[in-house]
Amino acid sequence: MSTTTEILAHHWAFALFLIIAIGLCVFMLTGGFLLGGRAKGRAKNVPYESGIDSVGSARLRLSAKFYLVAMFFVIFDVEALYLYAWAVSIKESGWIGFIEATIFILVLLAGLIYLVRVGALDWTPVRSKRQVVKSDIINTTNTHPQ
């Protein structure tokens, strides 16, 4: 028996799964294309607001802070996954594994401290912080005792 037939014999279920998944995707895309309605005209690009005429632009500018928080979450979530894998195999890793995990946690802590110091986790912009500090200074210097 050759190696290609052995590979096919062992992986026929995966190949069948791939064929069915790709076929289902093609079927759904062509079905939507053939059965879907086609609107032509200016009203096609106007959003439908439950019968209410839309007012203003639907494009909102979101702060990049949402993106940063999502990235920090993914990074720390993957690191938590590594710690979970270490915790599962703690008996096999012994003291060397404990020391490595401690170093790993200290590196994570250093990264978190760096993010806090840089201000990556602050939601208020630096401009508004300066305005708050200046307004507090102005309010304290302009107060007249009565």
Swiss-Prot record:
Gene3D superfamilies: NADH:ubiquinone/plastoquinone oxidoreductase, chain 3
Assigned EC number: 7.1.1.-
Listed GO CC annotations: NADH dehydrogenase complex; plasma membrane
Topology versus the membrane: Multi-pass membrane protein
Transmembrane segments: 14-34, 68-88, 96-116
Keywords of this entry: Cell inner membrane, Cell membrane, Membrane, NAD, Quinone, Translocase, Transmembrane, Transmembrane helix, Transport, Ubiquinone
Record's catalysed reaction(s): a quinone + NADH + 5 H(+)(in) = a quinol + NAD(+) + 4 H(+)(out)
Domain of life: Bacteria
Main localization category: membrane
Subcellular location: Cell inner membrane
GO molecular function: NADH dehydrogenase (ubiquinone) activity; NADH:ubiquinone reductase (non-electrogenic) activity; quinone binding
Function: NDH-1 shuttles electrons from NADH, via FMN and iron-sulfur (Fe-S) centers, to quinones in the respiratory chain. The immediate electron acceptor for the enzyme in this species is believed to be ubiquinone. Couples the redox reaction to proton translocation (for every two electrons transferred, four hydrogen ions are translocated across the cytoplasmic membrane), and thus conserves the redox energy in a proton gradient.
Quaternary structure, from the entry: NDH-1 is composed of 13 different subunits. Subunits NuoA, H, J, K, L, M, N constitute the membrane sector of the complex.
Recorded family membership: Belongs to the complex I subunit 3 family.
PANTHER family according to UniProt: NADH-QUINONE OXIDOREDUCTASE SUBUNIT A (PTHR11058:SF21), NADH-UBIQUINONE OXIDOREDUCTASE CHAIN 3 (PTHR11058)
Name by which UniProt lists this protein: NADH-quinone oxidoreductase subunit A
Originating organism: Pectobacterium atrosepticum (strain SCRI 1043 / ATCC BAA-672) (Erwinia carotovora subsp. atroseptica)
Gene symbol of the encoding locus: nuoA
